[in-house]
Amino acid sequence: MLSAAFITLLRSGGNQVKKRVLLSSILLQDHRQATPACYFSTSEARCSRFDPDGSGQPATWDNFGIWDNRIDEPILLPPSIKYGKPIPKISLENVGCASLIGKRKENEDRFGFAQLTEEVLYFAVYDGHGGPAAADFCHTHMEKCVMDLLPREKDLETVLTLAFLEIDKAFASYAHLSADASLLTSGTTATVALLRDGVELVVASVGDSRALLCRKGKPMKLTTDHTPERKDEKERIKKFGGFVAWNSLGQPHVNGRLAMTRSIGDLDLKASGVIAEPETTRIKLYHADDSFLVLTTDGINFMVNSQEICDFVNQCHDPKEAAHSVTEQAIQYGTEDNSTAVVVPFGAWGKYKNSEITFSFSRSFASSGRWA
């Protein structure tokens, strides 16, 4: 339960917060008014009454991972009072993103991020195949679709599920009305994350683009690839009358063509069980432990494992450098596909920087592909 002293402290610092002054600065400025429960020194401010990670152990303000952060983020005052702990505001200007074409003739990856409401942020990556049309359509319309659903539906998992299905239906209408027959075979992955109040993180995905959270320096996977290798996905394909065939590299494809079992678009494969309904994940952030969220396309995922992604990002000074580092590393490892990364910093950014990086020597250098 949030103490009265903390509530008073947050409220008294409201004006400074509006001026983008960190709560840590307020605490240091007001140290002479500290209650007996807290004591301060010139090196750090300590308080035994707050436990940011739920460990039950006395905590220092530095434990939150935001007080000495190199990214100066203000505090979200209402959520901080609501949840009883400091919640940093995620500034979109600090989000890192990078996209490289690789050895492809065209970059079919798309990405985006935006503030949808005062409480909700949006982050997304789309990896198109069979042309960029489906990825472009999602990039153009998904954000608004989600925004329109938010006032009518409070559950973010439901919002994203409805948005994916609506966008897929809208793309089908668009493709059937178009004179361009290639739109019928255009499709895309979609991995979309919504962050509410700086604490509630919800991710929805179809295809094999991924989202992972770095917690205490370790990767926490928030998505699972939709491929014919999954028993449940393969059974659905067969139930719909489709089949799975393997190419010369041993990669399974739906009807011998598509390397994924869920996507937006791919209208010619809907009858074979390729669906647009996403799988969703909801997680509560702990800014004392959580360094960043990263969204990646398969040009990265098939070459750089999750721990390596965490390590590469943790070595970087800021998220922009990190996004470029991850995409460039995939190129160095031999990917031929488009590579895209979106890096969203959280409270523990920079807290788990390691001096050593463990590399995977079991890496496959076979180029990824959507089509057999």
Curated annotation (Swiss-Prot):
Recorded phenotype for the gene knockout or disruption: Mice are born at the expected Mendelian ratio and display no developmental abnormalities if fed normal diet. However high-protein diet, either during pregnancy or during the postnatal period, results in increased plasma BCAA levels and premature mortality in neonates.
Cofactor remark from the record: Binds 2 Mn(2+) ions per subunit.
Entry annotated with the keyword Manganese: yes
Coiled coil: none
Taxonomic placement: Eukaryota, Metazoa, Chordata, Craniata, Vertebrata
Similarity comment: family membership: Belongs to the PP2C family.
Domain annotation PPM-type phosphatase: ranges: 94-346
GO molecular function: [3-methyl-2-oxobutanoate dehydrogenase (lipoamide)]-phosphatase activity; manganese ion binding; protein serine/threonine phosphatase activity
Ranges for region Critical for association with the BCKDH complex: 46-61
Annotated compartments: Mitochondrion matrix
Induction annotation: Transcriptionally regulated by nutrient level of BCAAs.
GO biological process entries: branched-chain amino acid catabolic process; regulation of mitochondrial membrane permeability involved in apoptotic process
Top-level lineage group: Eukaryota
Protein name (record): Protein phosphatase Mn(2+)-dependent 1K
